[in-house]
Each structure stands twice: as C-alpha cells, then as structure tokens.
C-alpha cells in the first residue's frame, strides 16, 4: 500500500502514520523527521534546512524532492510506504507523480486528517511545551498553518479528482482515529 497522509500541522499525521505503518508493515517517510534529525545533528542538510525552518518557512522543493526521491528508491519501500509531510504544494505533486512513474509504483490512497484550527493550535502549544521543538513558536505555528491553508489544502482537490482522497476526522482517541482510517483503506 502506498499512501500519502495529509493535513495541517498538529492534526496527528505523524502519530497516525506510525500506527498505519505498523498495521500495514510498511515504512513511514516523514520529511519533517528527516529534516529534524539532520538539524539536530547539524549536518550540511540540517543547517541548510534550519535557515528556513527557524523563520517558519518551508524548506525549498529542490531539497525536499531530492530527499523523497532517494528514500522512495530504497529496498524497504518496494512493498509500499506512507509519505508524511509531502507533497506540500502543486510543484511537489508534479515531482511526486514523476517519481512514482519512474518507479512504476502508483499511489493507492491519500488520507486527509481534519481538525478545527483551535484544536490544532492547542495541540501544537502542548507539543512545544513537551518536546521543546524550536519550530513550534507561536509565530512559526501561525505561519505554518497559514501556509498549509494557502498552498497544501488545495492539493486535496487534485487527489479527490483522481479518486484517491479519503477524508478522516482527526479529533478523538488515537486508536479510534486509526480505526476510522483503516476502515476506509481495507
């Protein structure tokens, strides 16, 4: 199974991606996790990414596309994967389409998690307090939500037109949300 998991920051994409990966026995590819690992370890990639994320900006497509393409080509992705945090804009949709065509691996489903803005803000404030993520300042949170609404949310229409979109309420018990997603996919 090849899935995209989409939704605004704080909706629970990472949590649900991990549970779905375990359920379907496929890897999760989180561009955010890849970037955070590299930022934490101050790699060349991390320092480049940090120059954007510290200002609440998205990492440029050229960098993100390269990371995703390299990761999708790995052996553990042969039987499927879950992409979390990608694509985020129309240019990345086109890039992903090209990658999947090259790999001869069509996308199966796009899961869109939804939650009200006040729920998202509360979750991100809590995450910032618990995890101390540098990119969870109030200003960065507001900017990322605004960017999602402007650039990423419209992508759901593309996937809906392709018949791939599954919209799921991202509010409630974690296992309950997973159950909703799995019932749509199986």
Curated annotation (Swiss-Prot):
<keyword id="KW-0418">Kinase</keyword>
<dbReference type="InterPro" id="IPR000850">
    <property type="entry name" value="Adenylat/UMP-CMP_kin"/>
</dbReference>
<dbReference type="Pfam" id="PF00406">
    <property type="entry name" value="ADK"/>
</dbReference>
<keyword id="KW-0547">Nucleotide-binding</keyword>
<dbReference type="InterPro" id="IPR033690">
    <property type="entry name" value="Adenylat_kinase_CS"/>
</dbReference>
<feature type="binding site">
    <location>
        <position position="92"/>
    </location>
    <ligand>
        <name>AMP</name>
    </ligand>
</feature>
<feature type="binding site">
    <location>
        <position position="172"/>
    </location>
    <ligand>
        <name>ATP</name>
    </ligand>
</feature>
<dbReference type="GO" id="GO:0004017">
    <property type="term" value="F:adenylate kinase activity"/>
</dbReference>
<feature type="binding site">
    <location>
        <begin position="85"/>
        <end position="88"/>
    </location>
    <ligand>
        <name>AMP</name>
    </ligand>
</feature>
<keyword id="KW-0545">Nucleotide biosynthesis</keyword>
<dbReference type="GO" id="GO:0044209">
    <property type="term" value="P:AMP salvage"/>
</dbReference>
<comment type="pathway">
    <text>Purine metabolism; AMP biosynthesis via salvage pathway; AMP from ADP: step 1/1.</text>
</comment>
<feature type="region of interest" description="NMP">
    <location>
        <begin position="30"/>
        <end position="59"/>
    </location>
</feature>
<keyword id="KW-0808">Transferase</keyword>
<keyword id="KW-0963">Cytoplasm</keyword>
<protein>
    <recommendedName>
        <fullName>Adenylate kinase</fullName>
        <ecNumber>2.7.4.3</ecNumber>
    </recommendedName>
</protein>
<feature type="binding site">
    <location>
        <position position="144"/>
    </location>
    <ligand>
        <name>AMP</name>
    </ligand>
</feature>
<comment type="similarity">
    <text>Belongs to the adenylate kinase family.</text>
</comment>
<comment type="function">
    <text>Catalyzes the reversible transfer of the terminal phosphate group between ATP and AMP. Plays an important role in cellular energy homeostasis and in adenine nucleotide metabolism.</text>
</comment>
<feature type="binding site">
    <location>
        <begin position="10"/>
        <end position="15"/>
    </location>
    <ligand>
        <name>ATP</name>
    </ligand>
</feature>
<feature type="binding site">
    <location>
        <position position="127"/>
    </location>
    <ligand>
        <name>ATP</name>
    </ligand>
</feature>
<feature type="binding site">
    <location>
        <begin position="57"/>
        <end position="59"/>
    </location>
    <ligand>
        <name>AMP</name>
    </ligand>
</feature>
<feature type="region of interest" description="LID">
    <location>
        <begin position="126"/>
        <end position="136"/>
    </location>
</feature>
<dbReference type="GO" id="GO:0005524">
    <property type="term" value="F:ATP binding"/>
</dbReference>
<dbReference type="InterPro" id="IPR027417">
    <property type="entry name" value="P-loop_NTPase"/>
</dbReference>
<feature type="binding site">
    <location>
        <position position="133"/>
    </location>
    <ligand>
        <name>AMP</name>
    </ligand>
</feature>
<keyword id="KW-0067">ATP-binding</keyword>
<dbReference type="GO" id="GO:0005737">
    <property type="term" value="C:cytoplasm"/>
</dbReference>
<feature type="binding site">
    <location>
        <position position="31"/>
    </location>
    <ligand>
        <name>AMP</name>
    </ligand>
</feature>
<feature type="binding site">
    <location>
        <position position="36"/>
    </location>
    <ligand>
        <name>AMP</name>
    </ligand>
</feature>
<comment type="subunit">
    <text>Monomer.</text>
</comment>
